[in-house]
Amino acid sequence: MGNRGLSKAGIVLALVLGGLPLTVLGADAARQPDNRAHVDRAETAQAQTRAVAITEALFSYSSADLPAQRAEVADLITGDLVTQYAELLGQAEEGVRGQQVAFTSKVTHSGVRLLDPGKAEVLLFLTQSSTRPGEAPQSAGAQFVLTLVRGGSGWQQAKGSAIDLLGAR
């Protein structure tokens, strides 16, 4: 088998190995839903903007007016998230009873991890600052996923979704 045999074997091996990544990528892509998060910039931006607005409204409130906070977010959330948010706000109310404290949340980074024609999953990172009279502001970070669905008026929080705190409890 001289040099000529080695060259043919090398070419065949190169073709087989060169096609392997395409086969693996093709098989993986076949299992994935039609994710347009990195392709459809306009829809990605709309879903991301809506998720940021919902998140900042949910997590910015004052202890002086928690009933108003509940009313304000009533139109933003549905389904399981209504129950989960009521529990979170109830815990907050217990923790700040008799205190004057305001929480302001700002989404610092976000990204759409899934986008198809009817659904978007948005990963959000936020900083929440608390201010009390006579004290320096304090900050903490959080991250979670918010699922949105496409409705007649645009992107809205999905009925069956809750805030996925990514394992943080």
Placement of each model-derived feature along the sequence:
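Amphipathic, hydrophobic N-terminal targeting peptides for secretion and organelle import
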Residues: 1-37
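Core segments of small alpha/beta cavity-forming domains
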Residues: 42-98, 102
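Surface-exposed, charged secondary-structure patches
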Residues: 98-133
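Hydrophobic/aromatic beta-strand elements that line small-molecule binding cavities or substrate pockets
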Residues: 107-112, 142-148
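Structural motif
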Residues: 119-123, 139-145, 155
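Solvent-exposed, non-transmembrane alpha-helical starts
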Residues: 133-139
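Short beta-strand edge/turn micro-motifs at domain boundaries
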Residues: 143-169
